[in-house]
Amino acid sequence: MNHFELFGLPNQFELDGGLLSAQFLELQKRFHPDNFATSSERDRLLSVQKAAQINDAYQTLKNPVTRAEYILSEQGHDIRGEQTTMQDPMFLMQQMELREDLEDLLSSSDPESALFDFSENVSAMRKTQLAELKQQLESELWQEAAQSVRKLKFIDKLNQEVEKLEDKLLG
């Protein structure tokens, strides 16, 4: 049983987050190890394993990047944990420039406003890349989708750097 089947969801990238959360809570309640406290050792062990499977599946499906990685792995294109280098030099150059711009924000006349604008730009990039990824997965363009996932990981790392700088400025 794959992660989508576990939650009774269609096996597709686009999913209803509210339904995923509701199904997660229901399954978590049903298979919670406390419900099996008086059961046999075997049943207690099975409930712990099932609870772990439910938690793992939920963590995977709730994040679009890990959900896409999971879909790709189900199609024989497992890129989770890979160390493949990005093959798109223009994208890499853009990422380097964005990181330089982020560093330069601290010395701007209004760093908070500049950071807000920068963050909006990164969010727009992420949204665009997610839309591309959705199309690629729907069209079963697995290699292109894998490349989009790699790009999203770069964008997400950049977003984390934005959040760190935000904490530094506002903290």
From Swiss-Prot:
Family label: Belongs to the HscB family.
Identification of the protein by name: Co-chaperone protein HscB homolog
Biological role stated in the UniProt entry: Co-chaperone involved in the maturation of iron-sulfur cluster-containing proteins. Seems to help targeting proteins to be folded toward HscA.
Keyword set includes Chaperone: yes
GO CC annotations, alphabetized: iron-sulfur cluster transfer complex
Chaperone keyword on record: yes
Lineage: Bacteria, Pseudomonadati, Pseudomonadota, Gammaproteobacteria, Vibrionales
CDD domains: DnaJ
Subunit structure: Interacts with HscA and stimulates its ATPase activity.
GO MF assignments: ATPase activator activity; protein-folding chaperone binding
A Pfam family recorded for this sequence: HSCB_C
Family matches, as PROSITE patterns: DNAJ_2
Boundaries of every J domain copy: 2-74
GO biological process, one term: [2Fe-2S] cluster assembly
Keywords recorded for this protein, A-Z: Chaperone
